[in-house]
Amino acid sequence: MPTQDQLLQALATVIDPNTGKDFVTSKSIKNLQITEGDVAFDVELGYPAKSQFAAFRKSLIAAAKGVAGIQNVSVNVTVKIASHSVQRGVQLLPNVKNIVAVASGKGGVGKSTTAVNLALALSAEGASVGLLDADIYGPSQPMMMGIEGRPESVDGKNMEPMENFGIQVMSIGFLVAQDEAMIWRGPMATQALEQLLRQTNWRDLDYLIIDMPPGTGDIQLTLSQRVPITGAVIVTTPQDIALLDAKKGIKMFEKVGVPILGIVENMAVHICSKCGHSEHIFGENGGKKMAADYKMDYLGALPLDMQIRLQADNGRPTVVADPDGDVASIYKAIARKMAITVAAKAKDFSSKFPTIKISKDT
């Protein structure tokens, strides 16, 4: 009968293409059982990758069958997403494991489109995902997610999130008329956002994606200090002026102790739909160079494509409108890279410890 060591040695030859590590070293192999010629085990991933389950299973079965004496192999691939650490001194959010801020130093770089497609990509890969539209002066997620109406409240205090495409969504856009301007000062806007965040009944989320307001002003700084953020994704175009403002966003998150999960370069190249000629309208590799300069992960580049805009405007973003297309595949790859970076962070164990209260009477 084959031994466990023989089997693990064979399985260690299979590399996870997302992490570059084998499944044995990463301690992903669980519940290994050998009964004569039959083998069964689980593979537990720390990030969502449902579209790759079949490929993982096939590679692992082939490796296991390479061991003499093994005839039948059963592999069950699962995902277990853990809570990870946030800034010190910030109150955690119940039922939300990880909060990811999608930010940009300036408007118009495609931050909201990136945020909604990242949320949908994580969901498509098997995660439970929420989306908070924190762009209080220009909320766009209700339109992009194709959601109308107002959120309901069972107890008169907390709101139930709106939902579409399997994503839980909250936005100030659900609470005001579509053409109403939010003429609010910073403190009022920040308070409203905190209420949206903490008075929404989020239900067992692996990830809450926050579509941050553009810029690095008072609202962004206050949110970064008060919201328990696992990490931030910076969206930029290759254009020099966009990169200049993106660097300011990086500095802001660094000052408040929020790690940068990576850089997304949007509108990186335009491919003519008539002749196929590719042109770098906003410059070339600016986001990639910035990521290298700051020693940050370069999560990926997206094209300047009219379909991305049309699909978002029609309330069916690219990942749901064309799930098997090239652009959706890029969004899914970016989402996986981001989730892997989150999984590599220190886990949050605060819920494992009792709260210690000190009073004058003790």
Report residues per predicted region:
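Phosphate-binding loop that captures ATP/GTP phosphates
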Residues: 122-184, 190-198
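Short glycine/serine/threonine-rich phosphate/pyrophosphate-binding segments
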Residues: 108-118, 139-140, 212-220, 242-245
